[in-house]
Amino acid sequence: DQTRILNVFDQIPPQLSRDNKKFQLSKVASGARFKDYRGCIEWLKDAGIVNVCYCLNFPELPLKGNYDETKYKLYFADTGLLVAMLDEEAQVDLRANKNLGVYKGALYENIVGEALVKSGCGLYYYKRDDSTLEEDFFVRTANNLVPVEVKATNSKSKSLSTLINSEKYSDITYGLKLINGNVGCVNNIYTFPYFCAFLVKKYLSQRK
């Protein structure tokens, strides 16, 4: 109903601000269950308000059918909505590109998620409960699964390297990292500036 939809909507910014961005219904209402809120999330998605990013059971092809519909992140379909829901001081800081704090990673991830959806990609992520291995997004090509990492800082990408180099993930041979920097490639990790996110699918389709 309307109240539940609004409660989910209002919870998106604070939940994106956390390190673990998996959407938790327990933060929406005490005792909330997925089956009771499934319709609310579907309504927000169908209305073009949110993009749902599902957690893969395992990082391998195919993507469809290989995810847990009860584990997901919610991003805004328009990053402007996320910015508009920040407090006034945070909006001023954003325009000045300073003091972004906990929302820095959320903003970059939301921008990339929005760009991927608008270029025709579905949204999937991976996080193992029993380890630190996690990846922000995955995009598929005809023969490969490509992990996409969004870095708010130009730090090392341990999970991305593990996915590329481990024999356990045979569908993954290279990865993409979106950063505040230039185009490059080191150890099968291709880096692109954030603003190139909308070109990811086109780049992968043309890559030999």
List each language-model region with its residue ranges:
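Accessory nucleic acid-recognition modules appended to NTPase machines
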Residues: D1-A142
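Structural signal for conserved beta-strand scaffold positions within catalytic alpha/beta enzyme cores
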Residues: N51-V52, F76, Y125, E149, ...
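Active-site-adjacent loop/helix micro-motif of nuclease/hydrolase catalytic cores
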Residues: N154-L163
